[in-house]
A protein has these predicted regions:
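Short loop/turn and low-complexity linker motifs enriched in small/turn-promoting residues
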Residues: 16-138
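Sec-dependent bacterial lipoprotein signal peptides
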Residues: 1-17
Length: 138
């Protein structure tokens, strides 16, 4: 019985696993999320991302596609709305010079209905900007 409880507990913990260790031969891109928003890794170079929490890419040029979900406050909507309107958007970020062993950070936000994304290097220098690739209401 104890073995069964221990095994069940370990299986539950495995589902809550943290991020893997970065591969030093790849570039690692962290996704920075904010309260009440969601940012997910979708694609790298038209291939589905294996993990929605980060990107890991070989050195060189790549196009990253992310999904960004965010609320638009009623004050930005106008009219009788009292609840936020949720937007579900995709953004594309291209960068030509990912380097092995380097960590990057992709940050997203919005101004009213318009989403934005920026890619930062380790020195917090902006090295890429996101381009909207479509939005819808949720």
């Amino acid at each position: 019985m104890r073995t069964l409880m221990l095994t069940g507990g370990l299986l539950m913990l495995a589902g809550c696993a943290g991020l893997p260790d970065p591969d030093p031969t790849q570039a690692w891109i962290d996704l920075e999320t904010h309260q009440d928003t969601a940012l997910q890794a979708l694609e790298v170079d038209d291939k589905t991302s294996t993990d929605k929490r980060y990107f890991e890419v070989p050195p060189g040029s790549h196009e990253l596609v992310v999904r960004y979900q965010f609320p638009v406050e009623p004050t930005n909507i106008g009219g009788p709305a009292t609840e936020p309107l949720w937007r579900d958007c995709q953004l594309s970020v291209k960068f030509k010079d990912f380097n092995a062993g380097q960590r990057y950070q992709l940050q997203a936000g919005n101004i009213g209905f318009r989403p934005w994304a920026k890619l930062y290097d380790q020195q917090r220098k902006v090295v890429g900007q996101g381009q909207p690739a479509g939005c819808q209401r949720t």
